[in-house]
A protein has these predicted regions:
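PRPP-associated nucleotide enzymes
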Residues: 1-228
Length: 228
């Protein structure tokens, strides 16, 4: 299917996320450290291969006018969607040295023992390779910026960045072309200004069992705040 025909409509995208239970309500601490009453768990929609493929094709279609040599994603959230975007992109005249006919490579960067983002597992980029950085969700754009720095340190050239969801309200400024499939305006707060904290609601850190809340909050309250 041509990339231009792969673009999903907003209602189709929302339908996928909602049917997979990926849009959750409660009291959450995001990876940025901010708190929010809504969390989008992209892993829940990406666990379904046909959804992941369609989302990858649709996101790739936003960058169909660019010549790209590699897709780089920060682990863990960007792993699946990065692979699917790379799979959907035309191979073109790649500056890479991968196997002929293998397609655009999907590379991931991850945190090392010091907590710094790095390129490991034998991954590498050649000088001037044109890279698309792909993430699942943007809130502050911190992980994407870290991935961009790793690409540049490896000699690559970041030409664009993409995400499934931009929950920043368009505030993300990355210094390159940046596009998301869905723009969702979801309020988020520093912990000291969080109205949910002021109410004494327990906060959940998605992706882990770590729950932190008022001393009076029992395990039942903590479970409730995970949301629907």
């Amino acid at each position: 299917m041509p990339l231009a025909e792969a673009m999903l409509k907003r209602e189709e995208l929302m339908g996928m996320f909602e049917s997979a239970g990926a849009i959750r309500h409660g009291h959450f601490e995001l990876s940025s450290g901010l708190h929010s009453g809504m969390y989008v768990q992209c892993a829940l929609v990406l666990q379904y291969p046909r959804f992941a493929e369609k989302l990858g094709q649709s996101l790739a279609a936003l960058f169909g006018d660019l010549e790209l040599d590699a897709v780089v994603s920060p682990a863990m959230g960007g792993l699946i969607i990065g692979q699917q975007v790379a799979r959907a992109l035309p191979e073109g005249k790649s500056l890479g040295d991968g196997p002929v006919g293998a397609g655009v490579p999907a590379i991931f960067v991850e945190r090392d023992a010091t907590g710094a983002m790095s390129m490991r597992r034998g991954f590498s980029l050649r000088a001037a390779q044109r890279v698309l950085v792909v993430e699942d969700v943007w809130t502050t754009g911190g992980s994407t910026r870290e991935a961009m720095r790793v690409v540049e340190d490896a000699g690559g050239q970041v030409v664009a960045a993409g995400a499934l969801i931009d929950r920043s309200g368009g505030a993300i400024k990355l210094g390159v072309t940046a596009k998301a499939l869905l723009d969702l305006v979801i309020p988020s707060y520093p912990p000291k200004d969080c109205p949910l904290c002021a109410e004494g609601s327990a906060v959940v850190k998605p992706g882990s069992r770590f729950v932190r809340g008022a001393e009076s909050s029992g395990s039942a309250n903590a479970r409730t705040s995970v949301g629907r």
